[in-house]
Amino acid sequence: MPDRAQVIIRIVPGGGTKTLQQIINQLEYLSRKGKLELQRSARHLDIPLPPDQIHELARSWVQETGTYDESQPDEERQQELTTHIIVSFPAGTSQAAAYAASREWAAEMFGSGAGGGSYNYLTAFHIDRDHPHLHVVVNRRELLGHGWLKISRRHPQLNYDALRINMAEISLRHGIVLDASSRAERGIFERPITYAQFRRLERQARQIRFEDADLEQSSSQGDHPEFSQSPDTAPFEASAGRSEGMPYPNNRQNGSQVHLHEPAGFSNRAGGSVRIALETQRLAIFADDIESGSPPVSDVRAGNANADSDLPRSTVARTTDYSQRWSKRPRDDDEGPSGAKRVRLEGMAVGPEANAGERDSRGDPVAPPAETSRPSSLQDMARPNTATDPLAASGHLEQRRGTLSKRPRVEDDGEPSERKRARDDRSQDGRGGNRR
């Protein structure tokens, strides 16, 4: 025997209303703006409520409370005036039987007094989903007393077990077999998820389906001729750790075969790490080109871009831009060190070179002075050379110091400067003297 469907009675959390306008909005929502029929309680002979009388009915309900002050601001109201309940049936249930059973249940629980009191209520029967269900909006103010409707586990009549059992008995009379057992009786002890959690999971599932549809649409673009090129696996092999096919930067023959453009046909998500590997490899090749002084691979590729159909124009522009960026700064190998740095290095080399020259001249006075050669690198400048002419080195140093010095120096013929001659003249005339 298949398992019987469970009775579904749900008290909507936060479904109660506190103001007159909220009652109007709730009833208009249940009637789908007047498209569906709202039905009164058995006390009003089960007659339908016309859509144009919703405002009048809502005002009568707030007046029945006896405590509703229309001059009070709505944000200060705390008393809930209505309770929203949903009675749901399994999919495929007869709509007529479901409507009759749910209406009878609402009349017995809230209109007959069997539930501890008599209350006004309205119902709306919806069949917009697979499972038919009835919305019940109950006016919480008791008709023959001064109490308020309260459904709880401790209530003698209006508790959750009593609501399910009565619904199962009434449904059976209308040919609908339902089970009213509790979760503990069915061996289910885990706490169920709340309605808010269910709605949140439902929204997440819709979002995932939407993202999957976007991925399928983007993957379908691979059939376009623009994305039909075969991927170039050389950059992947090169970035995998210098295998046999890895082009070393110092090898010009192998380096010229490196493809610096991105392989076509890869998505943005999968190509993120590929782009990082390509950029790292590209920068390493350019750095090695600059240190070695040879033309970079990008210049070779850019020069043959018109002949090579595999390299797109955008790639040539990017690589050319890299070469221009690196070529703006002159290298020390071509230009040499700056003026101040060159003087400092030459000063370091003059001392030992002059002493060495004096020793050589004392030992062999006939030996001609050696030619002064310019050092080819910074290390050669700092290294002392005994074959260098001390007079030429000292003369060159004096010439450099003379150009860099700000104060005028005494000329080679020993004549004093104009300022010194004027000071000497004043001292001879007796106008000079010690200054105090």
UniProtKB/Swiss-Prot annotation:
It comes from Rhizobium rhizogenes. GO terms for molecular function: DNA endonuclease activity. Residues 216-232, 316-325 have a biased composition (Polar residues). The keyword Hydrolase applies. Its EC number is 3.1.-.-. GO terms for biological process: symbiont-mediated induction of tumor or growth in host. It comes from the Bacteria. Tumor formation by A.tumefaciens involves the transfer and integration of a defined segment (T-DNA) of Ti plasmid DNA into the plant nuclear genome. The virD operon encodes a site-specific endonuclease that cleaves at a unique site within both 24 bp direct repeats flanking the T-DNA. Residues 408-429 have a biased composition (Basic and acidic residues). Pfam families: Relaxase (PF03432). The gene is virD2. This is T-DNA border endonuclease VirD2. Keywords: Crown gall tumor, Endonuclease, Hydrolase, Nuclease, Plasmid. Residues 213-266, 290-436 are annotated as: Disordered.
